[in-house]
Design a protein with these regions (language model features):
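N-terminal signal peptide c-region/cleavage motif recognized by signal peptidases
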Residues: 13-15
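Sec-dependent signal peptide recognition
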Residues: 2-9
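Absolute protein N-terminus
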Residues: 1, 18-19
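Exported/periplasmic ABC-transporter solute-binding proteins
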Residues: 19-53, 57-67, 74-77, 81-90, ...
Length: 244
């Protein structure tokens, strides 16, 4: 059963005590889907949740500095690994919950790939490669297809995926390299073209979840819930891939 069917009921759940609040940090690209999954888990477990979104790099820094999160849903595998290695997360709790893909999107070009090389094609939006894994993958792709030199002077960097989408949505950047899942984001105007970014052109976008609070049973339950058939079905429906 698709989890969206629960939505009208779940937000009517009764308030619970403060210690039952599940605090989840999630990478911006996965925020919408995480919200759906958390609402379904709320229905199942009877817990309230607080969702914090941002770039993976910034959320990672917050966890390291003691931010009170129970679960971290990253857009990469590296930050969860570092959190485990540094003693900031529960050892052995991390795993890949989704794998992402990129597209080139344009509101003006007829040839999306061609717009990357065309100096007159306007700005190109992508997330910050330093803090956002999807931005790093976009940069790797541009280098792999020999478009970096033509594109670098035209790039506008969003702090995260959602800000990069905002640049495209407002027309500040007619071309964007964004997650495939956001091609039809409500904020986006109609595309004149889209093109799939070859997965071989960048490091895999393996998104991992890791448990931060060892003693929070709701957090452990949610991390396990993400492995369920219903959760995996929702993740795939959102446009991500899941591992076997």
């Amino acid at each position: 059963m698709r989890l969206r069917a629960f939505l009208p009921v779940l937000f009517l759940a009764s308030p619970v005590s403060a210690e039952d609040v599940l605090r989840v940090a999630v990478a911006s690209n996965f925020a919408d889907t995480a919200g759906i999954l958390l609402v379904a888990f709320q229905h199942q477990a009877g817990v309230e949740f607080r969702l914090t979104t941002g770039s993976t790099g910034k959320l990672y820094a917050q966890v390291v500095n003691g931010a009170p999160f129970d679960v971290f849903m990253s857009a990469d595998a590296e930050r969860p690994r570092l959190l485990e290695a540094g003693g900031h997360a529960v050892a052995g709790s991390r795993y890949t919950y989704a794998r992402g893909r990129l597209i080139v999107w344009s509101s003006t070009a007829d040839d999306c790939m061609g717009a990357l090389y065309d100096m007159s094609a306007g700005k190109i939006a992508l997330a910050n490669p330093v803090t956002a894994p999807y931005g790093r993958a976009a940069k790797e792709f541009l280098i792999a297809v020999n478009a970096w030199d033509a594109a670098v002077g035209r790039i506008v960097y969003g702090q995260n995926v959602l800000q990069a989408i905002q640049f495209a949505a407002t027309g500040n950047a007619p071309t964007a390299i964004i997650p495939r899942t956001h091609a039809n984001h409500p904020a986006m105007p109609r595309a004149t073209c889209t093109a799939a970014v070859p997965a071989s052109s960048h490091a895999p976008l393996e998104q991992q979840v890791v448990l931060i609070s060892a003693d929070n049973e709701a957090a452990r339950g949610f991390v396990e819930f993400l492995r369920s058939d219903a959760a995996r079905q929702e993740i795939v429906a959102a446009g991500y891939e899941v591992l076997p």
